[in-house]
């Protein structure tokens, strides 16, 4: 479901950028490029940045998306993976598997609620402002959508794995370029995609 959510996040960002950008025709090209895709494979570069470490850990891998509910990213010959399968988010680090539960799963659920609301024409849907703060910025040909889940419980907020998600789209080339998962402090994991 993580990859499905990434795909939905991507489509949402396109729709939001379409509404806010003067280059609506270019945004429509991005949406058209990915519309109706049943399978998608891309090269992905994962950059793990930790403020206390001098150098970032950079790893090349693959991103695979299969409709309707399966997607995964794999690195280090399968020792590191991020898997979304029918609403279950699994992370594998150095061969150790952990399934997102509790606060971490709730963060992904908030992200999914935001995305569903953006894509839904249902007027009874939950107000996005109740579950997340969103900000859209544009610099040159890049459009970035930042989604920050609203977690009112102070204890739960301290246990959050990610503080926000940033999706980047290249409007000129009509491509989904990256996803950044911001962590506490100045730490983050960046996924940069290419064909």
Where are the regions that the model predicts?
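Bacterial N-terminal signal peptides that target proteins for export
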Residues: 1-10
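Bacterial N-terminal signal peptides
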Residues: 9-18
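Boundary at the C-terminal end of the N-terminal hydrophobic targeting segment
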Residues: 20-24
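Flexible, processing/modification-adjacent segments and terminal tails
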Residues: 25-43, 48-49, 55-56, 92-153, ...
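Low-complexity, intrinsically disordered segments exposed to solvent
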Residues: 58-60
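An acidic-aromatic
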Residues: 62-113, 189
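Gly/Pro-enriched, hydrophobic low-complexity segments
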Residues: 126-195
């Amino acid at each position: 479901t993580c990859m499905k959510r990434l795909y939905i996040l991507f489509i949402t960002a396109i729709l939001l950028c379409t509404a806010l950008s003067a280059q609506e025709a270019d945004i429509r090209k991005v949406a058209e490029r990915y519309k109706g895709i049943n399978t998608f494979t891309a090269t992905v570069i994962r950059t793990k940045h930790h403020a206390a470490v001098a150098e970032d850990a950079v790893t090349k891998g693959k991103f695979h998306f299969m409709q309707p509910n399966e997607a995964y990213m794999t690195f280090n010959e399968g020792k590191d993976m991020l898997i979304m399968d029918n609403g279950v988010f699994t992370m594998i680090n150095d061969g150790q598997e952990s399934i997102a539960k509790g606060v971490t799963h709730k963060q992904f659920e908030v992200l999914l609620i935001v995305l569903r609301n953006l894509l839904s024409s249902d007027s009874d849907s939950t107000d996005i402002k109740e579950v997340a703060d969103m900000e859209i910025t544009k610099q040159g040909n890049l459009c970035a959508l930042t989604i920050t889940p609203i977690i009112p419980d102070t204890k739960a907020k301290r246990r959050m794995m990610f503080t926000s998600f940033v999706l980047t789209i290249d409007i000129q080339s009509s491509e989904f370029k990256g996803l950044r998962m911001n962590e506490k402090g100045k730490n983050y994991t960046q996924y940069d995609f290419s064909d």
